[in-house]
Amino acid sequence: PVDGDWGDLLRSASRHIGWTKPVPAGRGRGLAFGMKSCVPATESSARIRLRVDGSVVAYVGTSEMGQGAFLSFAQLVGDWLGVDPANVEVVMADTDVVPFDTLTASSRSLVHMGNALQAAAEDVKRQLAARPHGRQQGDIIGVGSFAAPPDPRHPLGGRTPFFEAVATAVELSVDAETGHVEIHKLVHVTDAGKVINRSRSSGLDDGGVVMGLGLALSERLEYGDKGLANGSSLDYRIPTVADIPTDTTSRFQENGDGPGPHGSKGIAEGGVLAVAPAIAEALFQCTGLRFREIPFTPERIWRKTNGR
């Protein structure tokens, strides 16, 4: 489903970059939009155990790899069952004990596994309510699952449950003598539907933006006669803390229109999408030249600006 307000994303990014203000001498501004779909035709299942002592165990097939699924799931389950998230244990990934999950990828876990956990939590509450006076005589186990609605018109038998839509704006300058690009300000806006864990979500988007900076300005594989020539961390140029603009802002559009819990959508992977085209447009505004090949390295910029 194509949802959200894409125009509002662009307006928000342009407003916070100061698009209508005069551009300082020697600088250029760029604004770009990006969108990606979530992988279609996948399924997630979850199981929740409510123990007699009031603690909760949630079993999920999701793998935690820094995206914050562990914290988000504990927060959601605690909210649905009325318990402190600190009393929610999340058991992940061990296929000997957790229900089926198609994969951990494509920013899908919050929507797919989140909905499966919500169904499992509702199952727990139904069972608890059916007992006399709500008394619990033993552990209660609830199960739930979620799958994107099938659509036979699509070649893979399904459709994406949501899109990641983002807008990025930058302000930069170019050193005429070296071709070095300095980004003075960067604003990134994501349509999150509804943010579940704000601090973790901001960190995820910031990380995606930094990956986008590497894609745009420095990262490429160099091959020589003996194969890959820059295959080490010493030679492959990823962004460092010194490369990140000090004035970097990640913001969220929250319309509550996503298919996940509380109207949420998956985020973070989209952070990469619009950085390079925004920088390309800012380079054009700054130099009057179109750069159509990434990364925009100092050498490439110097050669083009000097007619080489």
Question: Predicted regions span which residues?
Answer:
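Cofactor-centric catalytic regions
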Residues: P1-L81, A93-V209, L215-D243, R300-R308
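Extended, non-catalytic structural segments that build the interaction scaffolds
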Residues: A58-M65, N255-V275
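Alpha-helix N-cap/start motif
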Residues: D84-P85, F291
